[in-house]
């Protein structure tokens, strides 16, 4: 059965446990960075960073709020990145029937028009390595979930912000949580729930969290 995530940003504390767990499980190196006077680190996705907690300070109702957004690939129902890559090589990006995972393979390095693949993503997720055209992003921890384990990011979350299971279960959980918080947050919404397998809940306008929070 198709899988999915429910990401409840109202429960995210920006501990970045998900970000660290993702790197540890995939054996990816830390990103060289510098102190910019802001807490978000690294500043953006890269070839070795598939999960990133974005942090934005916003003035809401006359007070400063810190908004956290644990960003990742949405594993779209109809992934435009794959549709674009398929024009060159239908095996460069795989859409797994069993899980719904959108998986970038090493064959992406042979795609000449990699820029079109990247720009096709409405969430600005894929990144390429400097040495070639090979691209990478969240792989849904497909090696874990096909062996009965949850994704690394989900197992590390201490607050219940990250959730994973059958897509129908995640959709129901997201809808129930939205109804629960609507009284306190009138602008709360689910981000593109009909188009993605990673459903984000935001308490405020999604664009306050990240420019590409919604398509």
From Swiss-Prot:
CDD domains on file: W-FDH (cd10559)
Residues reported to bind [4Fe-4S] cluster 2: 22, 138, 141, 153
Entry keyword set: 4Fe-4S, Electron transport, Iron, Iron-sulfur, Metal-binding, Periplasm, Repeat, Transport
MF annotations from Gene Ontology: 4 iron, 4 sulfur cluster binding; metal ion binding
List of residues binding [4Fe-4S] cluster 1: 12, 15, 18, 157
Ligand binding ([4Fe-4S] cluster 3): 73, 76, 81, 121
Compartment(s) where it occurs, according to its Swiss-Prot or TrEMBL record: Periplasm
One CC-aspect GO term: periplasmic space
Pfam (any one): Fer4_11
Disulfide pairings: none
Signal sequence region: none
Cofactor(s) of this protein: [4Fe-4S] cluster
Isomerase recorded as keyword: no
Domain 4Fe-4S ferredoxin-type: 3-32, 129-168
Cofactor: binding comment: Binds 3 [4Fe-4S] clusters.
Subunit comment: Heterodimer of alpha (FdhA) and beta (FdhB) subunits.
Physiological role: Beta chain of the formate dehydrogenase (FDH) catalyzes the reversible two-electron oxidation of formate to carbon dioxide. FDH loses activity in the presence of air, but this activity can be restored. This chain is an electron transfer unit.
Protein name per the record: Formate dehydrogenase subunit beta
Source organism of this protein record: Megalodesulfovibrio gigas (strain ATCC 19364 / DSM 1382 / NCIMB 9332 / VKM B-1759)
Top-level taxonomy: Bacteria, Pseudomonadati, Thermodesulfobacteriota, Desulfovibrionia, Desulfovibrionales
């Amino acid at each position: 059965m198709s899988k999915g995530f429910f990401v409840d940003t109202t429960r995210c504390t920006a501990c970045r446990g998900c970000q660290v767990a993702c790197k540890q499980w995939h054996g990816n190196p830390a990103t060289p960075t510098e102190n910019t006077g802001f807490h978000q680190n690294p500043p953006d996705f890269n070839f070795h960073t598939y999960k990133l907690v974005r942090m934005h300070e916003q003035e809401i109702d006359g007070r400063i709020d810190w908004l956290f957004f644990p960003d990742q690939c949405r594993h779209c129902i109809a992934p435009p990145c794959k549709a674009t890559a398929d024009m060159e090589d239908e095996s460069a990006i795989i859409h797994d029937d069993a899980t719904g995972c959108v998986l970038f393979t090493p064959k992406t390095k042979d795609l000449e028009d990699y820029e079109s693949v990247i720009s096709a993503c409405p969430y600005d997720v894929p990144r390429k390595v400097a040495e070639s055209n090979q691209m990478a992003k969240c792989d849904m921890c497909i090696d874990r979930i096909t062996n009965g384990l949850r994704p690394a990011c989900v197992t590390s979350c201490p607050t219940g912000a990250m959730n994973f299971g059958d897509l129908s279960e995640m959709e129901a959980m997201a809808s129930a949580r939205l109804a629960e918080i609507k009284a306190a947050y009138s602008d709360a919404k689910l981000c593109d729930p009909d188009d993605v397998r990673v459903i984000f809940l935001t308490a405020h306008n999604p664009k306050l969290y990240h420019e590409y929070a919604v398509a």
